[in-house]
């Protein structure tokens, strides 16, 4: 398949079966779910450790555990999505998320805190991008990339909206009360939105294109799928490690902490800009070509960040460029299954594809920090991560179905 409207990926659903409220509702719930369940933690973690005496390593490990649970849970969630649609999955996920955030807020000890985060990982699998992408892919058919772009643009605002809100609440409330307030917001916004806006009939899966393997199992065991999974996993590791290590890299290069933080924030703005360009890119390129190119571009920006000594404004520009590539890569992964194997088994296959990527993202911050010392600094770490991205790009060459 070489374009967005790959005929074998058509769902057969028309505008009549498309719930009008689903897209705006998912935009709002992605902002809220990501903002509360994910982005509130880095804002509150210093207060949590100061209040409880738990180590930063221990609290961060609990958070990473949630990401690992999300990766593992995403596979069965994908199967349910394929069969039954997103309403029950995402509504239940919101309920679990509220319970988990309240449990985090009132955890009396580190073990309870960790258990609450593991429960939050289940909520992540049922409410974050994966189920939203599955819903939009089935309902929007050949127009899915437009819908996916809109919801990822909205999701990119989660940190913009909830990081300052969380910080503001924490200035006046304890971290526990702040989390309790956020849990109420999560309940009020996401539970009714998922329960009411996703009520449309779930269209039957389209038939598998005749030239492709029959059944999701055959696809999942195929060489192109395994190479694609390996490529995206390596890229995910490099991408998450770069994001976490960007601020210390820039401070090593002479940027003050405020400027380095702004560079990270502007990189997020670059992600949003990059996502607006993906539809045009996908129309003009074959799926394997753009996969290889975007992974290579990601490695290129990482290499430049690792080798260009300055000045700081140039490094900020490179951070924005890296963000633009990351924004495209989000949509590349969202459409990787449909552009190659159609929508028939999207939920399960995308869950299988996302699981190792999520695990890599959970491991990357710790691995990056552990490697920085032996390698001799963040510049050397970025050079290594660029090589990892280059390997990912080479693996992606073989991801085209036969």
How should these model regions be labeled?
Residues 21-56, 74-77, 163, 242-247:
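Extracytoplasmic
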Residues 72-110:
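Conserved MFS/SLC helix-loop-helix module at the cytosolic interface between two early adjacent transmembrane helices
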Residues 340-375:
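A late C-terminal transmembrane helix in Major Facilitator Superfamily
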Residues 267, 271, 285-336:
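C-terminal transmembrane helical hairpin of 12-TM major facilitator-type secondary transporters
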Residues 142, 151-201:
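Helix-loop-helix hairpin linking two adjacent transmembrane segments in secondary transporters
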Residues 73-85, 274-287, 372:
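Helix-to-loop junctions at the C-terminal end of transmembrane segments
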Residues 41-45, 222-276:
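Extracytoplasmic gate region of multi-pass secondary transporters
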Residues 117-153, 342:
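Cytoplasmic helix-loop-helix junction between adjacent transmembrane helices
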């Amino acid at each position: 398949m070489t374009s967005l409207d790959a005929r074998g990926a058509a769902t057969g659903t028309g505008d009549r079966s498309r719930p009008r409220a689903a897209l705006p509702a998912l935009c709002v719930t992605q902002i809220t779910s990501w903002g509360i369940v994910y982005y509130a933690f880095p804002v509150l973690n210093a207060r949590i450790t100061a209040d409880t005496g738990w180590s930063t390593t221990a609290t961060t490990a609990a958070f990473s555990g949630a990401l690992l649970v999300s990766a593992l849970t995403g596979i069965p969630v994908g199967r349910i999505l394929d069969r039954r649609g997103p309403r029950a999955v995402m509504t239940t996920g919101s309920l679990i998320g509220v319970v988990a955030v309240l449990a985090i807020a009132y955890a009396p000890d580190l073990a309870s805190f960790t258990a609450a985060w593991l429960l939050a990982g289940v909520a992540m699998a049922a409410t974050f991008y994966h189920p939203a992408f599955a819903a939009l892919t089935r309902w929007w058919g050949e127009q899915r990339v437009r819908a996916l772009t809109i919801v990822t643009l909205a999701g990119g605002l989660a940190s913009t909206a909830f990081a300052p809100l969380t910080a503001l609440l924490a200035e006046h409330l304890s971290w526990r009360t702040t989390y309790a307030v956020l849990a109420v917001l999560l309940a009020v916004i996401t539970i009714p939105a998922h329960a009411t806006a996703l009520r449309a009939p779930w269209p039957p899966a389209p038939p598998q294109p005749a030239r492709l393997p029959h059944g999701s199992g055959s696809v999942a065991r195929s060489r192109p799928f395994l190479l694609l999974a390996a490529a995206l996993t390596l890229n995910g590791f490099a991408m998450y490690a770069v994001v976490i290590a960007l601020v210390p890299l820039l401070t090593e290069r002479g940027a003050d902490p405020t400027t380095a933080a702004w560079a990270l924030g502007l990189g997020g703005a670059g992600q949003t800009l990059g996502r607006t360009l993906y539809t045009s890119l996908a129309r003009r390129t074959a799926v394997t070509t753009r996969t290889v190119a975007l992974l290579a571009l990601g490695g290129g920006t990482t290499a430049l960040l690792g080798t260009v000594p300055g000045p700081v404004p140039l490094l900020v520009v490179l951070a924005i460029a890296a963000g633009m590539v990351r924004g495209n890569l989000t949509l590349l992964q969202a459409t990787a299954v449909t552009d190659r194997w159609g929508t028939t088994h999207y939920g399960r296959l995308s869950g299988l594809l996302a699981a190792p990527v999520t695990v890599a993202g959970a491991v990357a911050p710790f691995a990056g920090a552990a490697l920085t010392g032996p390698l001799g600094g963040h510049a050397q770490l970025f050079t290594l991560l660029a090589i990892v991205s280059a390997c990912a790009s080479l693996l992606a060459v073989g991801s085209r179905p036969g």
